[in-house]
């Protein structure tokens, strides 16, 4: 199921979704064609950790390729963030918490920018009875500057999976992931689990709305686990171009208070 696959890619990579198809195919059907999609998008997040505020803007670019049931995707952001200098702000996604906090008496706020971490994912979709399933391996390559506190400077990797089922014009889904976090110098980190539940609502053959709840375990004891709710709209501008917008609101104290996203996918 394309919707299930593409939703997980979006959740896992934190990048724009691939050009989605709203006409969901039966899970018994083997898709044999090959698609390549160029990805672009922007994400804005703001919040506070331990009373320290931050704002982050990520400009993402990437590519996704699908052949039959196999999917490969890669993305890399350019990050601009304003935050206390002792906070490490990463590009988020399944392979790291959006924010790592190191205990410090410093509180000077600084603005830094640069290339974020490269995210790679390889996945496979398959049916389980009446369900559509997708499983993927994920790697975060530490291309972001550790000196600028735009990343941890360490390699992360993990597994993620999602199941979904179409019921009329509704497609409920649930996803989960486990991530092995590379430990940066000066931080005590732990591996993390994350998950989300929600549903797609098919408005037409080319448009859908998604509502979801997400939980993400913190990689450090200095930051609380994240909980949030979100809503998004994805629609086709043409047979090759899709546009998506989404918004999330934090439910826990250390989760981003607000997160806004804009994405576009151009298929070939």
Describe the residue ranges of each PLM region.
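Cleavable N-terminal export/targeting peptides
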Residues: 1-32
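Transmembrane beta-barrel domains of Gram-negative outer membranes and organellar outer membranes
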Residues: 20-183, 192-268
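Active-site cleft segment of glycoside hydrolase catalytic domains centered on the general acid/base Glu
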Residues: 187
């Amino acid at each position: 199921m394309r919707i299930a696959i593409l939703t997980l890619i979006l959740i896992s990579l934190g990048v724009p979704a691939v050009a989605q198809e709203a006409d969901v195919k039966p899970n018994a059907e083997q898709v044999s064609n090959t698609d390549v999609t160029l990805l672009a998008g922007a994400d804005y997040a703001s919040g506070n950790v331990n009373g320290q505020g931050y704002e982050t803007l990520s400009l993402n670019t990437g590519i996704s390729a699908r052949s039959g049931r196999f999917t490969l995707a890669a993305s890399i952001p350019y990050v601009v963030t304003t935050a206390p200098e002792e906070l490490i702000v990463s590009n988020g996604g399944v392979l790291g918490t959006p924010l790592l906090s190191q205990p410090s008496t410093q509180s000077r706020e600084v603005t830094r920018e640069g290339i974020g971490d490269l995210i790679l994912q390889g996945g496979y979709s398959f049916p389980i009875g009446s369900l559509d399933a997708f499983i993927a391996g994920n790697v975060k390559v530490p291309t972001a500057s550790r000196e600028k506190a735009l990343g941890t400077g360490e390699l992360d990797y993990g597994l993620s999976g999602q199941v979904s089922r179409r019921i009329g014009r509704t497609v409920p889904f649930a996803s989960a992931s486990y991530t092995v976090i590379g430990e940066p110098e000066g931080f005590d980190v732990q591996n993390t689990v994350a998950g989300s539940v929600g549903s797609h609502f098919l408005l037409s053959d080319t448009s859908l709305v998604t509502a979801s709840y997400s939980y993400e375990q913190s990689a450090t004891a200095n930051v609380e686990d994240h909980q949030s709710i979100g809503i998004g709209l994805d629609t086709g501008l043409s047979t090759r171009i899709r546009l998506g917008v989404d918004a999330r609101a934090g439910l826990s104290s250390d989760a981003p208070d607000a997160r806004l996203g804009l994405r576009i996918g151009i298929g070939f």
